[in-house]
Amino acid sequence: MARANRHHIPGQVWHITHRCHKREFLLKFSKDRRRWQQWLFEAKKRYKLQVLDFAVTSNHIHLLVVDSDKNVVLNSLQLIAGRTAQEFNKRKKRKDAFWDDRYHVTSIRDGRAYTESFMKLQMGF
């Protein structure tokens, strides 16, 4: 089955989730969560990613971002996920996948959906 295309909608708020491969707890140590966070901040600088909120759990991440320009979200997620996985695998001397297939994106269309996503982030879901 073909993958769905990603859409660019200027000003659109997206809730992004990305799970570790096989739901493993690859982000269980604060060192690994901090590295993911550092790559997030690098993406903000490099691509001008607009981050509203984020949460990093032991086996997945959540991001609330604003789509500001074509490929900003795509390039940012490639940088963050790719570098996090490379560093982890190099440090642990492993070659396995770090992330599940693709990150999942949900469009936040109204204030209620935004509030629900924000509350989930704050509660760690």
What residue spans do the PLM features occupy?
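Short catalytic/metal-binding and nucleic-acid-binding patches
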Residues: 1-125
